[in-house]
Amino acid sequence: MSVRELIIVGAGPSGLSAAIAAKKRGIDCQIVEQGVLVNSIYRFPPQMVFFTTPELLEIGGLPFVSPYDKPTRAEALRYYRKVADTFDLQIAFDERVLAVTRDEDERMFELETRSSKGVRRVRLARHVIFAIGYYDHPVRLGVPGEDLPHVSHYFGDSHLHYRQNVVVVGGGNSAAEAALLLHRSGAHVTLVHRHPTLKRTIKYWVRPDIENRIKEGSIAARFSTCVIEVRPTSVVVRQIPDEAAATDDEAARQRELFADADASRAPASALVAPGPSDGPAVNEVPADAVYLLTGYRADSDLLCRAGIRLNEREAPMLDPRTFETNVPGIFVAGGAIAGKDTGTIFIENGRFHGDRIIEAIAQRL
């Protein structure tokens, strides 16, 4: 069985960037990807627009040409296909890495993989880079009914839900954009968020839109509310005491903003930012479909099985200069570095990790 100098787990932008750097150095490299090219971007909603400019998504020095200030999902997919072809990168698709272990003499690593059709194989490499991102592993609520067929952690095409009751759980960009798209496609939308306010990180052009739709009652909103069960035709929710509202300026601003919402236009399920004086209440929200857009995490179990130590935030412990972990020869790049703090690593900064990793590997050869 042949031994590669380097295997990169993940064909996202950070993995592709590392592979390009390796190729420029003449380092034998293979990418193994459990899904398709840039799988996370592929799973974004079809109408998705990036929160950045094209040049900040570029890798390998290949220009990302777009007529727009902010590129679309379709443009990004086309660009990264061009990257893979231009640099003739070796990528094995539909291979999920199950485990990474050292062989007995510790001169190489064994990667056990399995395809969606159940085909298993073992690959050997002297160095491994985990560039697995985090979008493939949603943060689960752990409530009854979370696995029902009408429940998803990923938002797709809003047209499917014309005239349906749809519950969107979350308070960030994904939830806000999904709620708006659903509303404009004729769905009856209820937004459920466990905190008293929307997240501060919502895109600047999305925030006024979602706030105004809530204010006018077009989108029902339940702040300081958590999901306790998903049923076939409804979602059971419970209010959370809004203890932080008194000291949170943003919470106060949003309560004032939504206070005069036109109740006559809002669905019967609408409830906006309950205050601390309101007792906890449990009730049901009608739901033909449910989107749990509550965030994502890297596959920490896979990292741990490879012997990588994680800190209290589930981020891998590594050398900040080289991104090498406590396991010599294993590196981490891109979103997998972030642990629970997924808002710190993006394509814009993760695309540079590969250069530093490959520099460290090249010095050992």
Where do the protein language model's features map onto the residues?
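Rossmann-like dinucleotide/flavin-binding elements
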Residues: 2-3, 8-34, 154-201, 322-365
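Short glycine-/acidic-enriched loop or helix-start segments at secondary-structure transitions
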Residues: 18, 41, 102, 139-141, ...
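FAD-site-proximal beta/loop scaffold in flavoenzymes
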Residues: 146-160, 263, 267-272, 278, ...
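A Rossmann-like FAD-binding core segment of flavoenzymes
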Residues: 88-95, 99-101, 105-118, 122-125, ...
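Active-site acidic short loop of glycosyltransferases
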Residues: 3-4, 124-126, 163, 232, ...
